[in-house]
UniProtKB/Swiss-Prot annotation:
Chief location: membrane
Pfam families: FlgH
InterPro entries per UniProt: Flag_Lring
Organism whose genome encodes this protein: Pseudoalteromonas translucida (strain TAC 125)
Name of the protein in question: Flagellar L-ring protein
Record's subunit section: The basal body constitutes a major portion of the flagellar organelle and consists of four rings (L,P,S, and M) mounted on a central rod.
GO molecular function: cytoskeletal motor activity
Function: Assembles around the rod to form the L-ring and probably protects the motor/basal body from shearing forces during rotation.
Subcellular location: Cell outer membrane; Bacterial flagellum basal body
Biological process, per Gene Ontology: bacterial-type flagellum-dependent cell motility
Length: 227
């Protein structure tokens, strides 16, 4: 009974080490806060004019998002497929034998009518076979902010979208680097043109929790389980 109690207590303690997905994801994360246009840093000139060259655009200039705070719409078209297979097979056999001990006169030595001899054998084998197939796809749109313009002109973009539904919340987060040449005239860019892209799509709430295993199941499936 004592061993059962100790095992149960140890299971509860170790289960706390098993992390849950999206437990630290919250809305209004400052990291994904909107970036607003930089303030005008031009020195004020007392000429009586209200014209601001920083916020102005040439009549024939390209209207692409190229400044901090501008908005770019990302066209999500992501698709991945992966497969993996592994097979392992080992076999080992060993035998050891001691013939009957021969005594004086060339006769086997007997103890209690039985001759002295020894024999042992062992046989061990292992077979393992595993296969894994995974495919994912993501399509949709998300508008993000230009957070920074690098010296070479590339744009650091970042943003998120939250959807509050009856059974929970869903969110998309995206960040990466974009070349100005890849931004179209209507300020859109394909997701496969984003360098160092970090795209996260998940959710919180009853629907997401229903797809997650319980803490005890996660413990027995984790590396903490010794068997």
């Amino acid at each position: 009974m004592r061993n059962i109690i100790l095992f149960a207590a140890g299971t509860l303690l170790l289960s706390g080490c098993v992390s849950t997905q999206n437990s630290d994801v919250v809305q209004d994360d400052p990291y994904y806060a909107p970036m607003y246009p930089e303030p005008n840093v031009e020195p004020a000139v007392a000429n009586g004019s209200l014209f601001n060259t920083y916020l102005s655009n040439d009549l024939y200039a390209d209207k692409k998002a190229l400044r901090t705070g501008d908005i770019i719409t990302v066209k999500l078209q992501e698709s991945t497929q992966a497969s993996k297979a592994a097979k392992t097979e080992t076999d080992k056999q060993s035998d050891a034998k001691l013939d009957p001990v021969i005594g004086l006169g060339g006769l086997p030595v007997n103890i209690g009518g039985d001759s002295i001899q020894f024999g042992i054998g062992s046989d061990a084998s292992f077979k393992g076979d595993s296969k894994s197939n995974q495919s994912n796809s993501l399509a949709g749109d998300i508008s993000v902010n230009v957070m920074r313009v690098l010296p070479n002109g590339n744009l650091v973009i970042r943003g998120e979208k939250w959807l509050t539904l009856n059974s929970g919340e869903e969110f998309i987060r995206l960040e990466g680097l974009v070349r100005p040449e890849d931004v179209t005239a209507d300020n859109t860019v394909q997701s496969n043109r984003i360098a160092n892209a970090r795209i996260q799509y998940s959710g919180k709430g009853q629907t997401q929790e229903a797809q997650s295993a319980g803490w005890l199941t996660r413990f027995f499936s984790s590396s903490l389980f010794p068997f």
